[in-house]
From Swiss-Prot:
It comes from Elephantid herpesvirus 1 (isolate Asian elephant/Berlin/Kiba/1998) (EIHV-1). The keyword DNA-binding applies. Plays several crucial roles in viral infection. Participates in the opening of the viral DNA origin to initiate replication by interacting with the origin-binding protein. May disrupt loops, hairpins and other secondary structures present on ssDNA to reduce and eliminate pausing of viral DNA polymerase at specific sites during elongation. Promotes viral DNA recombination by performing strand-transfer, characterized by the ability to transfer a DNA strand from a linear duplex to a complementary single-stranded DNA circle. Can also catalyze the renaturation of complementary single strands. GO terms for cellular component: host cell nucleus. Keywords: DNA replication, DNA-binding, Host nucleus. This is Major DNA-binding protein. The keyword DNA-binding applies. Residues 1140-1143 are annotated as: Required for nuclear localization. HAMAP family: HSV_DNBI. GO terms for biological process: DNA replication. Belongs to the herpesviridae major DNA-binding protein family. GO terms for molecular function: single-stranded DNA binding. It is found in: Host nucleus. Homooligomers. Forms double-helical filaments necessary for the formation of replication compartments within the host nucleus. Interacts with the origin-binding protein. Interacts with the helicase primase complex; this interaction stimulates primer synthesis activity of the helicase-primase complex. Interacts with the DNA polymerase. Interacts with the alkaline exonuclease; this interaction increases its nuclease processivity.
């Protein structure tokens, strides 16, 4: 715990918990905000990020000690933290923030209708008699023209309920001049009502007419706070009475009732409609449900309304994509950044286990006994979060198990619809509008059964039959979107089960994502300082020093630069052999040293088997200030985490005190205080969540504030004539002097499988591999022209002929025969040797990766790990690609209607402009990616387990999980009968590196999609080594039969990102386009691309190249390496794919 006077909490100054900002409008700032805000068509409130020099002044204090109430002439200060967003009230010119907004249709009606069907109804009747304050009133009060200024509110987490209720009092006389960037502005404090009145009977229901008459109440602001903050919280908690939830959180903040149960009286449960659960199971599930609610509500605001550092990303003009850029460049960079984000938002929507849907607490049945209870371990295994989409189709029961809410009838063969998408947005029209914007810029995945979204657009725009927009905006409306993305939405009919949770968050600096993670890292080992037999124990194992020696060698030999990028140059076959031989010798020498060092440590092998990759995700709310939509995701994730962690103490309590009362609320009120007090201890230093604790000194001080009693007597709203403000020196007391803030949580992955017999990690028999598909393929393809300067065919074609020993049929000059034979023999030897100890199911793509893979493979082989793959973590990096506008109609003019589909495509061909779309591409260096501070979309499972023998504590661990769904991303792969289970040994993380984007770089040392099926066929073609003709023509024929006009990025994906093949294919496609060829059979392609070097039998000069004595056979590999090569997959038709295609 930090208790010095210089910690964030102690050094926080006194300040108000909410402000009204009035700042000048300029075209530049409007252009910027238009790209960053959340809007809704029928709301005059816009949600914008809290950023320095954009919405707040530089140096704006995020953590302040707010004057909350006046008691016995003493001011009570409470530490508060500002929300990372502001709320712009823009009723006079609401179109200012809609330049970049898609017209998505009647989203508010859709959201409210869905919310009502799910049971979340809004009630604003309590505000009927309130006096409204508009942005025009604010501008008038401070005497500025409303057309030149806009008005917005910044508020702390603790004050948000007071702002919602309209209880905060504007101090119009305390008008402060500020400067935001080069714009002039003002700000006015919003004062707590309890500086002027008292709350009674521990219930905050203010009746003081001064508060009701003068409190800052804006109906659109109240509704926006309801839909963006409070109802999403209620949805995450499965708590239908949102109004009661708001009153509870307000009462808790003012009256400090955190340790008492507040929600149980009005909770509605759905577990009683589950016929698979016994009565005892239902009671246990109901108690877990409500207690998770109570714990989360009690801790959520105190955690958020605490002390936090201001991250560097709050300074907008220091972002690398903004700094020193022209205004046009800034806007272009922001637009591209949003397209990168579209991949993450799409993943959240298309994943069936997304945090946006995963709000339901479920239980495995048949494990509880109503009288005897259940063990803690059993409860922890049986209680889990799952998707709550189907809560729409479940009955609701009250505290006494009486039916209070009838379910909505569930149709047969139900498909994902607008109600479900609204549920993902927690029924917020602001959030849903932005989600639709991102999905409109995502790719459509077509299947053989998918409905044509183009037909939907053509028919509904011409006839006006679209129910979402009446046919006026079918290029962007939510109705057309539901049709276009139908194949990518999750399947909601699948069985509900325990699954990982997918979320999108920022990583922190610490990450260890090397292949063996924590093994041999100094931070993970402690030196035993005890002496044994007169000798000092060995130094901690340090794998890094041996790897650094290899890197030093590479730098001396100019193979890599200081940043690890490849710099080697190869100009001949001999030089290639010399470089690789020297590098391999260095790797093996350092490996021998490491193995020798490992012998000194008795537990080194166990440490190797338990090696752990890990990274941390940021829980500072201000890290997400740049995106209000990510703030929404952050809050959903935080609630999910707190509920999951609460299950630990809940399970212990239920196990000790089984339910015996007739009403759940009686049991909850009896036991909640102990649950509340034990929760903090149960999560502190338990392996998952990291908190920062602060202790504040000087709990009693003196400070000068407005004379609040005088202000109430002489309250004025007219500020045209400035007058002096009466002030008083008050004695101030802190509400509490211990606070805890959220720092991060950790996600781990163990790459070495525990189950040695698991089929998912067994190595299949691939036979003798072609070197072009081996560990050095990245070099022989990169330096193909340097190694074979007189060869005009592609690397794949040449090595296929070498492999099949058919070069003697072609006139080709490979160079000196002895050099060629030596080089080819060397390549096959390296390929066979590498594969003999290979445990990594990925090919290296750089020198650094080759070093790491070879080092790890040989280390594992020497340690007894043989015949098995290990798990790997694949970073899928977002990238932007050019695409055709046909698939992204959001870029077209909405007023244009089309009579036929052909007319639509003809119009698209005439479209002028570049259209980009966000996609993903596998990134070879996962650890290097995490050094670039990426925004990640990651699936994780929160596991709970007991400690070692003698330790009764329950620990938590975040385990890297999987994505659930078939339409998430085509790089996630496909499960099929002929798969070798590589999808089971690969974990994927979507990454967008933010270094050089938002962060400045710090120098230091069962849909089956057409593309998926095609990629599998091409992979099989590349894996089958049979000769007879150019393998590239077979690949080209297969691609052109299925893909119309593929672009370079399509070819990269289909060929597994083998650039040399994609480039060669792309060149051939250009030739075909110029010749206007329509037949893509292998025979037709052979006529267009004849073997230029093929001669007749009498003229063949390549007959001297016979490599049959060089290329090893499978029996040779068995004899040399001792590998047990077995048939892994049985394919009914053993005819090679190339031959089947020709037949």
């Amino acid at each position: 715990m930090s208790s010095d006077d210089n910690n964030i909490a102690s050094s926080a100054s006194s300040g108000h918990g909410a402000w009204i900002y009035i700042t000048e409008k300029t075209p530049d700032v409007l252009d910027i905000l238009n790209r960053l805000v959340l809007t809704s068509a029928d709301s005059d409130v816009t949600i914008a990020p809290l950023l320095y020099d954009v919405t707040v002044e530089p140096g704006f204090e995020l953590t302040v000690k707010c004057p909350l109430m006046l008691t016995d002439n003493n001011v009570i200060l409470k530490l508060s933290n500002f929300m990372p967003c502001v709320f712009i009230i823009n009723s006079t010119s609401s179109e200012d923030f809609r330049f970049c907004e898609d017209v998505v249709g009647n989203v508010s009606e859709i959201c409210e209708g869905a919310a009502s069907r799910y049971g979340y109804t809004a009630d604003f009747t309590e505000f009927n008699e309130r006096t409204e304050t508009t942005d025009s009133d604010v501008c008038s009060n401070v005497n500025v023209p409303e057309s030149d200024y806009f008005v917005y509110i910044a508020c702390t987490y603790g004050y948000k309920e007071l702002l919602f209720k309209g209880y905060l009092i504007p101090h119009w006389q305390d008008l402060r001049d500020i400067s935001i960037g080069n714009r002039r502005g003002y700000k006015i404090p919003l004062l707590s009502p309890f500086l002027f009145t008292q709350c009674k009977d521990d219930t905050v229901q203010l009746t003081d007419q001064f508060i009701l008459d003068n409190g800052f109440y804006n109906p659109d602001l109240t509704k926006t706070l309801y839909s963006y903050i409070f109802r999403p919280l209620a949805v995450s908690l499965r708590y239908l009475d949102v109004t009661h939830l708001i009153s509870v959180t307000l009462n808790q903040y003012i009256t400090d009732t955190h340790a008492t149960a507040k929600l149980c009286d009005k909770k509605v449960y759905t577990c009683h409609g589950n016929n698979k659960l016994s009565t005892g199971d239902r009671d246990v599930l109901a108690l877990c449900d409500i207690l998770a609610n109570e714990v989360t509500v009690s801790y959520l605001t105190p955690f958020l309304d605490s002390a936090y550092d201001a991250p560097s990303t709050l300074d907008f003009y220091s972002w690398p994509i903004v700094k020193d850029k022209t205004h046009a460049e800034i806007l272009e960079n922001l637009d591209q950044f949003l397209l990168h984000m579209s991949v993450h938002i799409g993943t959240l929507i298309f994943s069936g286990n997304s945090v946006l849907y995963q709000n339901k607490i479920s239980k495995v049945g048949g494990q509880s006994d109503g009288s005897n209870g259940q063990s803690v371990e059993g409860l922890l295994k049986s209680i889990y979060h799952t998707t709550g989409i189907q809560l729409l189709y479940e009955d609701g029961y009250d505290d006494t198990r009486s039916l209070v809410r009838q379910h909505t009838a569930k149709p047969k063969n139900l498909k994902f619809n607008m109600d479900h998408l609204s549920f993902g947005a927690s029924f917020s029209s602001h959030v849903l509008t932005k989600i639709v914007w991102f999905l409109n810029r995502s790719e459509e995945y077509k299947t053989t059964q998918s409905v044509s979204s183009t037909c939907y657009l053509v028919i509904n725009s011409s006839t006006g039959t679209c129910t979402a927009c009446d046919g006026k905006h079918c290029n962007t409306c939510i109705g057309a979107l539901m049709c276009r993305m139908a194949t990518r939405f999750p399947n909601i009919n699948r069985q509900q089960k325990k699954e990982p949770c997918v979320t999108t968050l920022l990583t922190r600096m610490f990450a260890d994502m090397t292949i063996l993670g924590s093994f041999g890292k100094k931070y993970n080992t402690e030196r035993d300082t005890q002496q044994k037999d007169g000798r000092v124990s060995a130094e901690p194992l340090d794998k890094a020093k041996y790897v650094l020696n290899i890197l030093d060698y590479c730098k001396r030999e100019c193979l890599i630069d200081s940043d690890g990028n490849d710099t080697l140059k190869i100009s001949s076959k001999q030089e290639f052999i010399k470089i690789i031989t020297g590098l391999n010798r260095t790797i093996d020498d350092e490996l021998i040293k490491l193995l020798s060092d490992m012998r000194k440590h008795s537990n080194a092998k166990d440490d190797l088997n338990n090696s752990t990759m890990s990274f941390t995700l940021d829980l500072n709310p201000h890290a997400y200030a740049f995106s209000p939509l990510l703030q929404f995701v952050y809050m959903k994730t935080l609630v999910n985490i707190l509920e999951s962690l609460a299950i630990v103490v809940i399970a212990e309590k239920i196990s000790s005190y089984p339910m015996t009362q007739s009403a759940y609320s009686r049991w909850v009120k009896q036991h909640f205080q102990s649950v509340y007090s034990e929760f903090k201890k149960s999560i502190y230093k338990k392996g998952f969540l990291t908190l920062s604790d602060y202790k504040m000194k000087n709990t009693t001080t003196n400070d000068t504030f407005t004379d609040f009693s005088h202000l109430k007597r002489d309250y004025k709203i007219d500020n045209t004539v400035r007058s002096s403000i009466a002030t008083v020196n008050y004695q101030c007391r802190l509400w509490n002097f211990h606070v805890s803030s959220l720092r991060d949580f950790r996600i781990k992955y163990k790459p070495i499988p525990k189950n040695k017999d698991s089929p998912y990690f067994q190595k299949a028999d691939k036979g003798i591999q072609n070197p072009v598909c081996g560990p050095l393929s990245f070099l022989i393809t990169r330096f193909h022209k340097d190694i074979f300067p007189n060869v005009n065919v592609s690397p794949m074609t040449l090595w296929q002929r070498i492999y099949s020993n058919t070069l003697k049929n072609f006139n080709v000059d490979l160079g000196d025969k002895h050099d060629v034979e030596t080089f080819i023999k060397f390549m096959f030897e390296q390929t066979v040797e590498y594969e003999g100890s290979n445990s990594i199911d990925v090919r290296p793509e750089t020198i650094l990766q080759y070093i790491e893979f070879r080092f790890v493979n040989r280390l594992l082989h020497a340690s007894g790990h043989r015949g098995q793959y290990i798990g790997i973590v694949q970073a899928l990096c977002t990238t932007l690609s050019d695409t055709k506008v046909d698939g992204l109609p959001c870029y077209l003019d909405s007023s244009r209607t089309f009579g036929t589909v052909s007319e639509y495509h003809a119009y698209c061909r005439e479209y002028n402009g570049t259209v980009k779309v966000g996609r993903t591409r596998p990134y070879c260096n996962t650890n290097g990616m995490f050094e670039r501070r990426p925004l990640v979309t990651v699936p994780y499972a929160l596991e709970k387990y007991t400690g070692a023998a003698g330790n009764a504590s329950i620990f938590q661990c975040g385990q890297l999980g999987y994505f659930s769904g078939t339409g998430i991303d085509r790089n996630l792969g496909m499960i099929n009968r002929t798969s070798d289970y590589n999808f089971m040994r690969r974990k994927h993380i979507f990454c967008t590196p933010l270094t050089d984007v938002l962060f400045t770089k710090i120098s230091r040392g069962a849909h089956v999609f057409d593309f998926d099926m095609l990629k599998q066929r091409i992979k099989q073609l590349l894996d089958e080594h049979c000769g007879g003709f150019d393998i590239e023509l077979a690949i080209l024929s297969e691609i052109l039969k299925h893909v119309k006009e593929p672009n370079y990025n399509d070819l990269l994906f289909i060929t597994g990102y083998q650039e040399h093949i994609a480039s060669s294919l792309f060149d051939k496609i250009k030739v075909l386009d110029e010749l206007e060829i329509s037949s893509y059979s292998i025979e037709s392609l052979q006529e267009i691309f004849p073997e230029k070097e093929e001669l007749n039998d009498t003229e063949a000069t390549g007959s001297g190249y016979d490599f049959s004595f060089i290329i090893p056979k499978a029996t040779d590999v068995d004899e040399i390496t001792g590998l047990n090569i077995q048939e892994f997959t049985n394919i009914e038709d053993e005819t090679p794919l190339v031959k089947r295609m020709r037949l």
